[in-house]
Regions:
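Juxtamembrane and boundary regions of transmembrane helices in multi-pass small-molecule transporters
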Residues: 44-68, 130, 134, 139, ...
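Transmembrane helical segments that form the transport core of multi-pass membrane transport proteins
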Residues: 95, 112, 122-132, 248-326
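Alpha-helical transmembrane segments of multipass membrane proteins
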Residues: 116, 120, 211-219, 273, ...
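Membrane-interfacial helix-loop connectors
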Residues: 147-205, 281-355
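Short, low-complexity intrinsically disordered segments enriched in A/P/G/S/L with frequent Arg
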Residues: 2, 12-13, 17
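Structural signal for alpha-helical transmembrane segments and their membrane-water exit/capping regions
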Residues: 49-89, 111-124, 220, 240-242, ...
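Intrinsically disordered, low-complexity non-transmembrane regions of multi-pass membrane transporters
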Residues: 23-51, 67-89, 224-254
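Alpha-helical transmembrane segments in multi-pass membrane proteins
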Residues: 108, 112, 116, 139, ...
Length: 378
């Protein structure tokens, strides 16, 4: 094996040429001699991505959340529950919820599609593979850390996670990025501390780390061997190809592909769940308490349902006021933001179905376990 890797890195290996070609990656017979000159034209692309990401996140996330933190500290509330409109008809519930939901997230959704497409044309693939390309704990951890500035909900993080996967990033790293965005959102943890108490926030942080890393690593194992073997990853890391297409042409094509594969199914799924919330979230009364009979169904409903960023906080605050026990409340705090049926469907073309089912089931289980822990400790 070392001799084979050495001969590959020296160039001219017919086996690796066919291997990389089958994966859709050009092979260079002499990596050292074909390295392009990385001048200003090369470095300005990742710099442009960082500028666009920083401006977009400041406008959509960082500035509004900074101001909302003071509101949460002063009033111990960040607004009314998005489910608190007493709809009884599924059709009216679908329309009413979709309107409120999309008004809350449309800016973040637009930014996510832009960033997910720009990621594929402005960031060199070998950079991404160095950081996130290999399956393992280190790559998964870096994927989770990479998510922290984003502060997106699961559906808005999905297009960026899809963009990462299309650049051949490992399953574990892409999943960690996707799940960590809503679960480990620093702003949400601060809001939760001011509104529900710092015990809830601490439990969410610890359980969130376990959820992000544990679920991602298990799903990585379920996914099996990556499409790119280690030798192919090494070759791509060492090689950088020159694309003859213009930036606008490449970005336009990538943007359309990402939009078409994620947004239509997203809108449809939100409408369906908006109608289904009539049955997913029953009217709360004091008899529900910490009953296990409600803990499990609410964990399942929370895993499937879709909400904007931090909306789980007023939802749980309202439900607890009406009599919901601590256990089911903690289960909702863990499952509602983590993933959702729409976000799972948005990623159907970028992850194996077994991986997505594994993520959904493990998220439900984590929610149930956290509910039991929360009922005992909080």
């Amino acid at each position: 094996m070392p001799d084979e890797i050495g001969s590959r890195r020296a160039g001219a290996s017919g086996y690796n040429s066919r291997l990389l070609s089958s994966c859709g990656i050009p092979f260079m017979s002499n990596l050292a001699s074909t390295q392009p000159n990385r001048g200003w034209a090369f470095w300005c692309k990742p710099l442009l991505f960082l500028i666009i990401a920083a401006i977009g996140l400041y406008y959509v996330k960082w500035s509004p959340y900074y101001l909302k933190a003071f509101v949460a500290a002063d009033s111990h509330s960040i607004g009314a529950s998005i489910l608190n409109d007493q709809q009884s008809s599924p059709w009216s519930a679908a329309l009413a919820y979709s309107q409120v939901y999309f008004l809350a997230i449309w800016k973040a959704a637009v930014l996510a599609v832009i960033l997910g497409s720009l990621l594929q044309v402005l960031i060199p693939r070998d950079w991404l593979l160095r950081l996130f390309g290999r399956a393992g704990f280190g790559s998964t951890l870096r994927g989770g850390l990479f998510a922290l500035p984003g502060m997106m909900c699961s559906c808005c993080a999905a297009p960026v996670a899809a963009g990462l996967r299309r650049q051949k990033v490992s399953v574990g790293a892409a999943l960690a990025f996707w799940i960590a965005n809503p679960v480990l959102n620093p702003a949400t943890l601060v809001f939760m501390g001011f509104v529900l108490g710092w015990g809830f926030s601490a439990l969410r942080l610890v359980a969130g780390i376990v959820l992000v890393l544990g679920v991602s690593l298990v799903a990585q194992r379920v996914a099996g061997p990556e499409q790119l073997p280690e030798a192919a990853v090494d070759a791509v890391v060492e090689a950088s190809t020159v694309n003859e297409q213009s930036f606008l042409s490449r970005w336009g094509k990538t943007l359309w592909q990402l939009f078409w594969s994620t947004i239509p199914i997203y809108v449809l799924a939100v409408l369906v769940l908006g109608a289904a919330r009539v049955w997913l979230f029953p009217h709360i009364d004091g008899a529900m308490g910490d009953s296990l009979w409600w803990l499990v169904p609410l964990a399942i409903a929370g895993t499937l349902f879709v909400i904007p960023t931090a909306a789980e906080i007023p939802i749980v605050q309202t439900m607890m006021t009406l009599g919901l026990g601590t256990g089911p409340a903690v289960a909702l705090l863990m499952t509602l933001p983590s993933i959702s049926l729409p976000s799972l469907l948005m990623l159907r073309k970028d992850f194996d179905a077994r991986v997505l089912v594994t993520v959904a089931v493990l998220t439900m289980l984590v929610g149930i376990v956290c509910g039991l822990i929360g009922a005992a400790l909080l």
